[in-house]
């Protein structure tokens, strides 16, 4: 049975983890956020978040975006390939509803999961 937890092993934790993703990465983007992915040598995908204060001004907005990104990742982690993902928020992300964000996340997760994406 699959577990849908989002524990420590599913997160990018150190600056080195993030730097590895930014080198030779594949991107899937929208006007609201970008997801960058790179293959890892682990048996599971990992997620990192970058939500700049310059893009989403309020802490409530940043926390909402991060919460929805984690939840979307948590629900789709078993369909995702073994890659490290970094989600980078853009200013217009705060204008979307929760439902619109989830749909957009699903679309971009699917795009990055295709075999032709490295």
UniProtKB/Swiss-Prot annotation:
Keywords: Endonuclease, Hydrolase, Nuclease, RNA-binding, tRNA processing. It catalyses: Endonucleolytic cleavage of RNA, removing 5'-extranucleotides from tRNA precursor. GO terms for molecular function: 3'-tRNA processing endoribonuclease activity; ribonuclease P activity; tRNA binding. GO terms for cellular component: ribonuclease P complex. Its EC number is 3.1.26.5. Signal peptide: none annotated. GO terms for biological process: tRNA 5'-leader removal. It comes from the Bacteria. It is an enzyme of class 3 (hydrolase). It holds the Pfam family Ribonuclease_P. Belongs to the RnpA family. Consists of a catalytic RNA component (M1 or rnpB) and a protein subunit. HAMAP family: RNase_P. RNaseP catalyzes the removal of the 5'-leader sequence from pre-tRNA to produce the mature 5'-terminus. It can also cleave other RNA substrates such as 4.5S RNA. The protein component plays an auxiliary but essential role in vivo by binding to the 5'-leader sequence and broadening the substrate specificity of the ribozyme. This is Ribonuclease P protein component. The lineage of its organism: Bacteria, Pseudomonadati, Pseudomonadota, Gammaproteobacteria, Vibrionales.
